[in-house]
Amino acid sequence: MPFDDVIKEVGESIAQEKCKRARLKDLDLIVLDNSIRESTVGQLRGHTLENKWKIYNEVKKCGFKFIIVAAFSHMTRVDDTFLRELVDSGEDVSNLFAFTEVMEAVNDTKTTPVGLSKMKSLGLINPIIEIDLAIDSINWEVFTVQDMCQLLSERIKWSRQTLSPNAKIMVNLRDFPDSMVYQMERLFTVVDFLGSLPATERPFGLLFEEPTGKFLPEEVGAWTAGKIIYFTLFYVTHLKN
């Protein structure tokens, strides 16, 4: 038949996709809901306090266990007031997360980042520490990748000592696509460092994103299926400890 080769190729492609879906069904996944964080792109107006509460209550109705509830800055945001009300209401904070920078400024690694400081004052315990590994604003010959690893270790220790010994600490590889393209060795060095920490010191997990819109889902998927996910699953995931 003239279409035998085409039919065979289509069948093989479908079989590969079915294998991927079968693997997904067996993975022990968590959902970290990010609905409360406001978008910085295409948003006409900010959230009100009432908006925050409505979103939070709807997310809880969905049954999601892990929820991101804030992103802080030096200015007072709606997030600050919302978190104060949330904690004062007696809400369980053990599975609530908030974003924080890893450093206060490029040339200031000593000051506790405002995100961590606000988490301490508001009573949150689970930080998502955001890092960039391919940015030019850092002189990587002066502040080396080993310095970044050391700083992450210090932030993790601070969080467990100051926020809670049971803190579920996440590290977000914020510029993951650019790091994979331009600074793959630096990226793997950091991930390998985090994964090689003793079980009691490791982060709860790693996050990564594609915030630029420059890369197709297939590209990010290929990276996810590669070395980075090996490190994440084998070393870092809390589910294996």
Give the label of every model feature segment.
Residues S73-F99, M103-G115:
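N-terminal active-site wall of soluble small-molecule enzyme domains
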Residues I67-A70, A98, N241:
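Short catalytic-loop micro-motif centered on adjacent basic/acidic residues
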Residues D4-V10, F72-M75, Q183:
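Short linear motifs at secondary-structure transitions and domain/linker junctions
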Residues P2-R45:
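N-terminal amphipathic alpha-helix/helix-capping segment at the start of soluble metabolic enzymes
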Residues K54, F64-R77, T81:
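Terminal or standalone catalytic/regulatory effector modules within metabolic enzymes
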Residues P2-D5, E38-F66, E85, S89, ...:
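Alpha/beta enzyme core
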Residues L27, D92-S94, E201-P203:
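A short helix-to-beta-strand connector/capping loop
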